A protein has these predicted regions:
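Conserved acidic residues
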Residues: 2
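Glycine-centered secondary-structure boundary/capping sites
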Residues: 5, 23-24, 160
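Structural motif
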Residues: 5-8, 39, 138-140
């Protein structure tokens, strides 16, 4: 395996089962620690936390890539389409690169990150988000790669480089 994409999937509905699979949690943590490129969007982002609160209010251990808790809120969090601009060079490209995405979640994180700046296409709402570095994109926004195909190419190139190490 040369890279990972951890997209949605509602891990908060399967906290007990995910926590019980220690081998998988440790494998994901070690792969990312060793530099395997990883895109973790929304539910995948939640899985990378130290702990995740399930729908019944019980916290379970997750992959521990991020030293933070992810927890339930009683309201819909940031919702809808957004434009993302990279605040720094990271897995998907250089500082200033842009890509569209969307968010839809009732969960929140103690560590939302600040590798990207999100802005609603209509209105003034904006915020920093995403934990990123040369090999990791981990945040709530789901990415729309058709809006920035070069970001997908950059990710695949980094996967190829990792696979030949």
């Amino acid at each position: 395996i040369s890279g990972m994409i951890l997209s949605g999937g509602y891990p908060e509905l399967h906290g007990k089962e995910l926590a019980a699979n220690r081998t998988m949690r440790q494998s994901v943590k070690e792969a990312i620690k060793q530099g395997m490129p990883c895109i973790a969007e929304c539910g995948g982002f939640l899985y990378l936390h130290r702990e995740l609160e399930d729908q019944d209010g019980i916290f379970y251990p997750m992959a521990e890539v991020l030293d933070a808790k992810a927890y339930r809120t009683n309201k819909l969090g940031r919702f809808g389409y957004i434009n993302l601009t990279a605040n720094e060079a990271q897995l998907l490209g250089d500082k200033g690169m842009t890509i569209r995405g969307h968010e839809f979640h009732y969960w929140e994180s103690e560590q939302c990150g600040e590798s990207f700046h999100a802005k609603k296409p209509v209105g003034k709402r904006q915020w920093d988000c995403v934990n990123g570095n040369e090999t990791l994109y981990a945040g709530f926004p789901h990415l729309f790669f058709w809006s920035a195909p070069e970001a997908a190419c950059t990710f695949l190139k980094k996967c190829e480089e990792y696979g030949t190490c």
